[in-house]
Amino acid sequence: MITMQNVRKKYKDFELELSLEIPEGRITGFVGKNGAGKSTAIKLILGLVKPDAGKICVFGNEGGELPAAVKQKIGVSLTESGFSSQFTVEDVWHILAKMYPDFQKDFFDQKCDVLKLPRKKKLKEFSTGMKAKLRVLTAISHKADLLILDEPTAGLDVEARNEILDLLREYIAQDEKRTILITSHISTDLESLCDDIYLIH
């Protein structure tokens, strides 16, 4: 599913070196303190930044920006990204329906009810927990084979964290070939969810 061989990325005051393999059907966690390189590792896998050295392979695609067909197979939730604060959940629904041929409209609607995400309220009025739940919901609503989630539970209370972790458990249980890569600086979140955990430091 994902392999990283002798991958290195260096910034002015930071250097990351990684070699790992994430097999199909596993939940893999990256744990480490803030600034350790978890988000950089995610961006390298997604082709958002280029490595200085080494080889990265995702779905058999080696290096560079991922092709559109591969992107359709991936659901992503990044901490610093999201939809415009002026959008409503209904707006997000329409965008996802256009972006993904396999977008599950009924599933999205049902989970909005379960997670108490109001459809007509602007996202700027959402709490931190509501925004986090929406980010994860958008990632899992188009039958992705691979989920990549960067700090999906950061800054959330216990109830919101548990709702997100339950969503992920339900998602992986629906298809044993589905794969999740999740990062967190809270090791207890990952210990209860993941098959494999890498310490990034």
Feature-to-residue mapping (PLM):
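Walker A (P-loop) phosphate-binding loop of ABC-type ATPase nucleotide-binding domains
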Residues: 33-37
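ABC-family P-loop ATPase nucleotide-binding domains
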Residues: 72, 78-135, 142
